[in-house]
A protein has these predicted regions:
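Anion-binding alpha/beta catalytic cores of soluble intermediary-metabolism enzymes, centered on
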Residues: 1-245, 250-254, 259-311
Length: 311
C-alpha cells in the first residue's frame, strides 16, 4: 500500500532549506580533488549553504573547478583552496581548521577513511570528546511517511551495550537537529522476544530498561524489535505487539555493522532511497560519505551536518 508523504519537512531537500538559514558555517574538505565532492561543493555554494576550504592538491582541485564547473553561478559564500602535499597533510590541515574554529564541519574527500580518522582522533589537535563516534544515516524512502534513521552502517563493527547506548544518544541528537523532538528508537534484532542465545535481543531489552531508568534520555527506546515490527504498524498489530515505538520507529539501531551496511545499501539500490549521513560524537559533525556515493548524497550529507552543528 502506498503511503503519501504529506509533510514537505520530511524531505531531505528541506534540510538544505534549514541549513541555509544558519550563519557562519564553514566546511573543511580533506583531499578535495574529486569530481563528485567538488560537484557537491559547487551545488552547495550555488545554494548559499556554507563557505568552503578545500585542502589537497591545488592544481588538481582547480582543474576540476575550472574545467568541469565553468558554469558555476556566483555565490555570496566563499571558496578557498589550500595546497597540501599529501593526503596525510590535507587531513591534518582540515582537522586543525575545525579544531581551531576556522571551520565548523569536516568533510571527507578522496581519502581513505582510516587516514582521516587518524587525524580526527589525534590527541593534540583532533576532534575527540570522549564519546563514541558513530555513523548516522537519514533516509528518505519512496512511499514511506517519515525519515528513517539508521545507525551504525559504517563505524562500529560489533558494539557492546554501552556503545549502543552512546550510539542511540548520538542518533537522537541528529534526529532532534532535523525536527524530530522526541525520537522513537528500535533496537533491531531477528525477533522481538528476548532469546538468551541472541545477544541483540538481550541488548535490546537492556537498552529499553536503561531508557526507562533515565540512563538514556531525550528519546523513547523499545526493543528488541524485528525490522517489520519496527517500521510497520500492521506487522506489529498482527504479532500483538503493543508499543509506542513499534510501527513508528524513527531510529533503527542495528546490532552490528554488517546489518547496518546491508540495510543502508539495500535502501539505496533496491528501494531507491535518498540519504544523507554524518559521523556524530565528535566536537563537530563529520561528513564521511563513501567515495562511491553520488554528489546528491554528499550534498544532503552536508546539509545534515550543518543542521546538526552545536546540537
Amino acid at each position: 500500500m502506498k503511503i503519501e508523504r504529506v509533510d514537505d519537512n520530511l524531505l531531505l531537500e528541506s534540510l538544505i532549506d534549514k541549513a541555509t538559514q544558519l550563519d557562519n558555517i564553514t566546511v573543511a574538505v580533506a583531499v578535495a580533488e574529486d569530481e563528485e565532492v567538488i560537484e557537491a561543493v559547487v551545488e552547495a555554494l550555488k545554494r548559499n549553504l556554507a563557505n568552503f576550504i578545500l585542502f589537497g592538491d591545488n592544481e588538481k582541485i582547480n582543474t576540476i573547478l575550472n574545467v568541469k564547473h565553468k558554469d558555476q553561478q556566483k555565490s555570496n559564500k566563499s571558496l578557498t583552496v589550500v595546497h597540501a602535499d599529501s593526503n596525510t597533510m590535507a587531513a591534518e590541515l582540515a582537522v586543525r581548521a575545525v579544531s581551531t574554529k576556522e571551520a565548523t564541519v569536516l568533510m571527507k574527500g578522496n581519502i581513505p577513511t582510516s587516514v582521516l580518522l587518524k587525524s580526527v582522533l589525534n590527541k593534540e589537535y583532533g576532534l575527540r570528546t570522549g564519546n563514541i563516534l558513530s555513523h548516522v544515516a537519514v533516509f528518505e524512502i519512496p512511499d514511506y511517511d517519515r525519515f528513517t534513521i539508521v545507525t551504525d552502517a559504517g563505524m562500529n563493527i560489533a558494539p557492546d551495550l554501552e556503545e549502543k547506548a552512546q550510539m542511540i544518544r548520538n542518533a537522537a541528537a541528529i534526529a532532534r537537529a532535523i525536527g524530530i523532538e522526541y525520537p522513537k528508537v528500535a533496537p533491531i534484532a531477528a525477533v522481538e522476544v528476548v532469546n538468551p542465545a541472541m545477544q541483540a535481543t538481550i541488548d535490546g531489552a537492556a537498552l529499553t530498561i536503561m531508557n526507562k531508568r533515565g540512563q538514556i534520555t531525550g528519546c523513547i527506546v523499545d526493543g528488541p524489535l524485528a525490522l517489520d515490527n519496527a517500521v510497520s504498524a500492521l506487522a506489529a498489530e498482527h504479532k500483538g505487539i503493543q508499543s509506542e515505538v513499534a510501527g513508528r520507529a524513527d531510529i533503527l539501531l542495528v546490532p552490528a555493522i554488517e546489518v547496518g551496511n546491508v540495510l543502508y545499501k539495500s535502501l539505496i539500490y533496491f528501494a531507491k532511497a535518498k540519504v544523507g549521513a554524518v559521523i556524530a560524537g565528535a566536537k563537530a559533525p563529520i561528513v564521511l560519505t563513501s567515495r562511491a556515493d553520488s554528489a546528491e548524497s554528499k550534498l544532503y550529507s552536508l546539509a545534515l551536518a550543518i543542521c546538526s552543528v552545536n546540537k
